[in-house]
Amino acid sequence: MRNNYLLDADETILDFLRSSRESFAQAMAWAGMERLASDYEKFRAVNDALWKAYERGEVTKSSLVVERFARFFAAEGVEADAAAVNGRYFGTLCATGYLLPGAAEFLRALRARGKVYLITNGTPAAQYGRLDALGIRGDFDGIFVSDEIGFAKPDVRFFEYVFAHAPARREDCIVIGDSLSSDIAGARGAGVPSILYAPRGVPDGA
């Protein structure tokens, strides 16, 4: 019986887009560039592309977080300290947590059926900070963050680490997440079934 649920965080149960949008607006205001707050979708596109590159092992996390703002500012034709602005954005993000609609009920339903482990490629400070802001860190039987493991989804080594340290037998696990490229592809590579759970709608290619 598959009753060990390996549950993704961002855009599966956590409303990352809301947290990110608010943090971006505050960072732009802090930098004296309030007019750019309305260009969040442009920043998001750059950020998403870099995270995909991270999943493929093409960039490091430390370079990604600064490069996203450097590219955004370059596209907007403005000069700014990308590292400083990222620091402001990230600091706000770490304390700004929201659940997606229905996430609390979904989490309770999973917990009633078995054990729930959070698996995420996010940064520890951002993930733990938002979970603590919501008061739900203790609702999980284990939390696995890529930066603490040394490998990121969809790398099979990420999942092997989870199986070994949960502890959870592979044959008892199922992955639930919103990303085809990290959650679903990672589950396939690790030899476990998966459920595409996308509250905002089924992504292209599903």
Per-range role (PLM):
Residues 120:
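Conserved phosphate-coupling serine/threonine residues in phosphotransfer and NTP-handling enzymes
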Residues 1-45, 74-75:
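Active-site neighborhood of HAD-like aspartate-dependent phosphohydrolases
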Residues 21-25, 62, 66-70, 124:
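An amphipathic alpha-helix signature
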Residues 1-5, 17-18, 80, 104, ...:
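Asp-based, Mg2+/Mn2+-dependent phosphohydrolase catalytic module
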Residues 49-88:
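A metal-dependent, Asp-based hydrolase signature
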